[in-house]
């Protein structure tokens, strides 16, 4: 999905987590994901690597990683919590409401506008999340 300076396994170890082989498998799958998988999809991918991994192990591991701040949970209005590694560089999301496709993008103009708005209201921005939802334009709308 994104370049990760340190592997999830390294981040977990730094935070004092015991890395079982099953956690390593789940961490590698998250790192290698080009999409934003939900727990059920992580489970499907995990059992292809290690058939002994249970769905409850995936749920517990995802919760552990999320609580440690090394993965981010997203709710893209499709009724599922979806996950990605916490990227080094901030990005926002554009979600296709018809297909569920998630497009990651960066916009210096949007980032600057958000900073300006926070300052105008007397705040220093420390974090934010922008998710845009839409449907593809029809050819006649272009």
UniProtKB/Swiss-Prot annotation:
Source domain of life: Bacteria
UniProt family annotation: Belongs to the Fur family.
Name of encoding gene: fur
Protein localization: Cytoplasm
InterPro entries found in the cross-reference section: FUR (IPR002481), Fur_C (IPR043135), WH-like_DNA-bd_sf (IPR036388), WH_DNA-bd_sf (IPR036390)
Protein name per its UniProtKB record: Ferric uptake regulation protein
Keyword presence, Zinc-finger: no
Subunit structure: Homodimer.
